[in-house]
From Swiss-Prot:
The gene is infB. Residues 585-587 are annotated as: G5. Residues 440-609 form the tr-type G domain. Residues 474-478 are annotated as: G2. This is Translation initiation factor IF-2. Residues 214-271, 289-311 have a biased composition (Basic and acidic residues). Belongs to the TRAFAC class translation factor GTPase superfamily. Classic translation factor GTPase family. IF-2 subfamily. Coiled coil: none annotated. GTP binds at residues 449-456, 495-499, 549-552. PANTHER family: TR-TYPE G DOMAIN-CONTAINING PROTEIN (PTHR43381:SF5), TRANSLATION INITIATION FACTOR IF-2-RELATED (PTHR43381).
Amino acid sequence: MEQMSVTQFAGELKMPAAALLEQLKRAGVDKSSAADLLTEQDKSRLLEYLRRAHGGGEPKGKITLTRKQTTEIRATDSTGRARTVQVEVRKKRTFVKRDELLGDAASAESPLLEEELSVAGEAAGEAVAAPEPVLEAAPVEVVAEPEPVQPEPLPEPEPEPVVVEEAPVQQAAEPEPVEAAAVAAEAESPESAQPAAPRARPVSITELLSEEEIAAREREARRHRELVERQQADLRARQQREAAAKAAAEARRLDEEAKARAEQQKKEEAAKPAAKPAPGPTGTLHRPAKADDKAGKDAKRGPAREADGAKRRGIKTRGEVGGAASGNAWRGAKGGGRHGRQQDDRQTFQAPTEPIVREVHVPETITVADLAHKMSVKATEVIKTLMKMGSMVTINQVLDQETAMIVVEELGHKALAAKLDDPDAFLEETDAHKDAELLPRAPVVTVMGHVDHGKTSLLDYIRRAKVAAGEAGGITQHIGAYHVETPRGVITFLDTPGHEAFTAMRARGAKATDIVILVCAADDGVMPQTREAIHHAKAAGVPVVVAITKIDKPEANAERVKQELVSESVIPEEYGGDTMFVPVSAKTGTGVDELLEAVLLQAEVLELTAAVDAPAKGLIVEARLDKGRGPVASLLVQSGTLRKGDVLLVGATFGRIRAMLDENGKPVDEAGPSIPVEILGLSDVPAAGDEAIVLGDEKKAREIALFRQGKFRDVKLAKQQAAKLESMFEQMAEGEVKSLPLIIKADVQGSQEALAQSLAKLSNDEVRVNVIHGAVGAISESDVNLAQASGAVIIGFNTRADAGARKLAESFGVDIRYYNIIYDAVDEVKSALSGMLAPEKREEVIGMVEIRQVFTISKVGSVAGCYVLEGLVKRGSSVRLIRNHTVVWTGELESLKRFKDDVKEVKFGYECGLQLKNYNDIQVGDQLEVFEIKEVARTL
C-alpha cells in the first residue's frame, strides 16, 4: 500500500492533524510536521499504543442485577370480606462474560479495537460492519446458559396461599425485560464504555490488517451470528411454551369458576323453597325426638344417602336435603346453621358481566324472527323496540335493511349492511370473456331526435324499406333494431321514438350504442326531445354525429340549426368543435352516403372490438308477448356468439332459445357481436333494458332467476310496508285523494312502461292515476276480473281483448278502451281526471243597490227601501253591505218586494224593498253589492 502523509491520514480519520501528531509522538513515532509520510510500521505502532491506552487487556466484566416488583391482588378472608394484599417479587441475576464467547485473545481484542477506531470515519465503516455482531452477541450469549443465569427469586413470606402462586407467574411472565436490562447494562460496563474517549482519532483497519486476518474475523462473526440466532430461537420456543402453559392454566381456572357459579346457582334455586317455614314433623306429638334422631343419622351417613332417604320416606327437611337432591351433593348436613349461610352468601357474589356487543350482518330484507336470532335476543324485544319507534309489526313481518339496522343499533349491537348469498357471484367467477380473443365488430348506431324530424324515414332510405308508413299515426312507438350491410361495412341501427313519453326507451338506446346520430329538422330546429337526446348521449359518453334532415324543403335553414346546437354545447367542426354535421334528405337521398361515411369514420377512431368465440352477452332492446309464440324478446348481442339452443338468463327470467329470427323475420342459427335478433323460449316477458347472458347450466340459470324473483318481491314488500307506515299520518291529515285506477295492456314492454309513466305524470294533490296492473299481451279474462274487483278502466295499447274477455266485460260492465297512438290515450285520461277535479267557485257581481230609507217593523225587524243603481237584484242572492267603502257584513237576502208584492228580481232603475237575513244594523246611505257564486269546471 502506498504511503500517505499525516495530513491525508488525519483527513481520512476525520480528526485534526495536530491531534494525530500528538498521538504519534506518544506512541513513539517521531513525526514533526503534517507533511511527513507515514509507513505501515508507524500505523502498527500507533494501533498498539491505542490498545494499551484504552484497556484492551482488562479482565472480563461481570454484572449483577437486582429487580424488585410490587403488585396488588384482592382476596377474601375467612369472614368473606375482600381485602387488598401487597405482593413483592424480588429477583437477582448475575451475568458473566465467558471465554468461549470471545474466542482467543487476538480475535477478541481486534473487534473491540475495530469498533473504537471506526465509529467516526465513513471509510472504515464498511470494514467493521461484519465483525460488529460480536459485541451484540456477548451479553445475549450468557442468557442461553441456564446454570449461571438462573434467577434467585426472593419473595416475601405471605400468609395467603395466593401469593405463593403469584410469584412464579410474575417470574415467568417477564424474562425479556430482565434480559434486555442485562444487555443494556453490559453495553454500559467499563469494558465497552472506555473506548468512547479516543473516537476523535480513528484509524482505518483495512490499512492495519492483512486479508487473512479480515477473513478470519468474518468467519468468527458469522459463527457468532449463527449462535445468536439459535439462542434467540430457543428463547422464543421457551416463551411460547410458557405462554401456552399459562393460557391452559387460565382456561382451567375459568372453567372451574364457571362450574362453581353453576353449582352456586343450583344451590340458590334449591334453597328458595326452604325459605318458607317448614311444617312440623310427620310423627305423633308424643314422639317428636325420634324423627329428629333419624334425620341426624341420615345426615351422618352423608348427603347422598340423606337425599335417598328423604326421597324414599318423604321426610320434610329444612332445605339441605332438597339442595342435595337437586344436584348440590357436595354440601353436607354440617353446612347448616349461621356459619354455613355466611359461606353461601360469600359464594353467591358474582362480578358484573359486560353486555355482549355483536356484529349483526343485516341483508336487504329480513324477518323480525331472523333479526332476533342474529342478535341472540327474543323476538318480543325486537317487537317492543319497533313499537317504541312507532311501528306495529308481527314476528314474521319483513323489515327493510334500513329499519333493521336502526333496530340493531337501538339494542346496543353493531349493524353491518350485508348482501345475501347471491348466486349472481357465480356469473363473475365463470366469466370466459376475459381470456377470449378480441376481434373488430360493427358499430351500433342509435338514431335519436325530436318527434317528426325524420328519423325513421332516414333509416328507411338506408334500408330501402317502408317502415314509417306502417307506424300508427306516422310516429315511431317502438324501438327497432336493424343491421345494414353497406359497401363500407356493416352498421347496426337502433331507431328510438322521439315522442316525450318514450324517455326510458331513448335512455336504453343510448346505453347500448357506440355512436348517436342526432337528427334535427332544418325547418324546425332544436326541440325539447332534441335536447334530451343530447343529454342522454353525454350521460352515456357516446360520440354524436348530427344529421340535419329535410334540407330539400324551401323553408330549411341549416345555419340556424347549427347556431341552436352550439348553445347546447354541440359544436360543428367548421366552428372549431369535434362534432360532424351532415345535411341529408330522406326523400332524395342527398347526403346519406356522407352520413354513413362519417359514422364509419367515427367507428374506426373508437376501435370497437368484442370477443367472438365466447358465451354471448347482450341487452334486451324490446320485449313482447306473442299470442302464438309466447314471450318474444329483441336482443342486441354485445359480445360473444349467441346460438340456437343456448341457455339464456335475462334478469328474473331464463329459458333455452328455441328459435332466433333476424329483423326481417328470417330464422338464423347464430348471431355475433352487434347483431340484433328476436329470440323465443324465455319463461316470461323480460324487462326492456335487462342484461342477458348465456350460461352453460340450465339448473344454475333457474336458481339465479328464482333468487332474483324472490329478492325483488322481498324488497318490494319491504318498501311498500315502509311507505305505508310513513304515509299513514299524511293520508289521515289530507283525507282521501280521488284516484283513477287503470289496467294497462300493451303490445311491447317498452310501450307499456312509457304509457304508465306518462299517465302517472298527470297526478296531482287532488287526483291520482293508480296503475293497478301493467303487462304485455292481449286483454284476458283475469284482467277483466281484476278491473271489476277494483273498479278500474282497462286501456289496451296496440292490443285487443279476446272473445272470452269481451263477453265477461259486457256482463260486468267493465270499460275497455283501445288506443294506437299514445297522444290519444294521454288526452283521454287527462280529460277523465279533469272531470274528477272539484269545480272552482267564482264570484260574479250582478248589481249594486243603495239604501235610501230604513223602516223598523215590530216582529219583523229592519226593512230597507232601496234603489237599484246597477244591474239587477235577485231573491236569495248573496250580498255585501258596504258602509264608507268598507265591507261590514256578507250574507243573503231574506225577502225582496216591489210595492206589496214579492218579486223574483228587480232591474236597474227601479225601487224595491228588501230585508237581510239575520241582520238589522242598516243605515241610510249604505250600499249593497249583489253577487252570485258560479262553479267553473277545472282542467289539468
